[in-house]
Amino acid sequence: MAPLDLDKYVEIARQCKYLPENDLKRLCDYVCDLLLEESNVQPVSTPVTVCGDIHGQFYDLCELFRTGGQVPDTNYIFMGDFVDRGYYSLETFTYLLALKAKWPDRITLLRGNHESRQITQVYGFYDECQTKYGNANAWRYCTKVFDMLTVAALIDEQILCVHGGLSPDIKTLDQIRTIERNQEIPHKGAFCDLVWSDPEDVDTWAISPRGAGWLFGAKVTNEFVHINNLKLICRAHQLVHEGYKFMFDEKLVTVWSAPNYCYRCGNIASIMVFKDVNTREPKLFRAVPDSERVIPPRTTTPYFL
């Protein structure tokens, strides 16, 4: 079989187009092999730029790259939730996969709670694949990649990046390293908590209104940071109208990278640039104006007629 034409894949994806089904399968298989080599806590060196949820907002992802720099010029960590809710989950995920395939050391993709079979069947990605390809094969190839995505990244051994937050079952980074991640996200337990939990003004742990994960407070955050010699925890998972929000004496930051979320929230988005572990700079960006994006018709015409 001919080697993958990664340059072609990147070029197609950059135009907000999706790949022929067989090419997508090959790209997904290729990225799965790359992800197999990554640790549950993937080490990353500064300088690096950390990004939050994207949710299929392809044109805003392009704006993110205009704001932060293109791959491979900038080294990126994306903290999950690439798909669902936006119009272009398929094209967004394809673009990120193509970049990962071409420059694996310049882009780290973490798993969010939406990188799951169950959630994508409810919030849009499954239906989008069905509409655009006329079958569910593309969705199946992508969900295999979901299972392989790593859970956390560790910047210069001092900044932990994870989609959701902490777990009462996890005290040390080594406990994250031993999770069996190649599976659908479970309904409870450590793996589930890492992608579902939220920081909140609570004492230690509280029941989450999301029905998965926990609410965790300053005390457990400070303990976790202290035990693991961390400076900061970066996470996404929650809309922040100002784009980012520090909590718990600046031991934790939420980064949100989907501007005007769901095309109606009116929020600003951000990315967090780390020159080194002590030098961080949020970069803010707004949604691309409607005149610069293609709004799909209510019912997309199937690709193969």
From Swiss-Prot:
Superkingdom as given in the UniProt entry: Eukaryota
Record flagged with keyword Ribonucleoprotein: no
Pfam families assigned to the protein according to its UniProt record, in alphabetical order: Metallophos (PF00149)
Matching InterPro entries: Calcineurin-like_PHP_ApaH, Metallo-depent_PP-like, PPA2-like, Ser/Thr-sp_prot-phosphatase
Entry keyword set: Acetylation, Cell cycle, Cytoplasm, Hydrolase, Immunity, Innate immunity, Manganese, Metal-binding, Mitochondrion, Protein phosphatase
Main subcellular localisation: mitochondrion
Protein name in the entry: Serine/threonine-protein phosphatase 6 catalytic subunit
Origin species: Rattus norvegicus
Gene name, Swiss-Prot/TrEMBL: Ppp6c
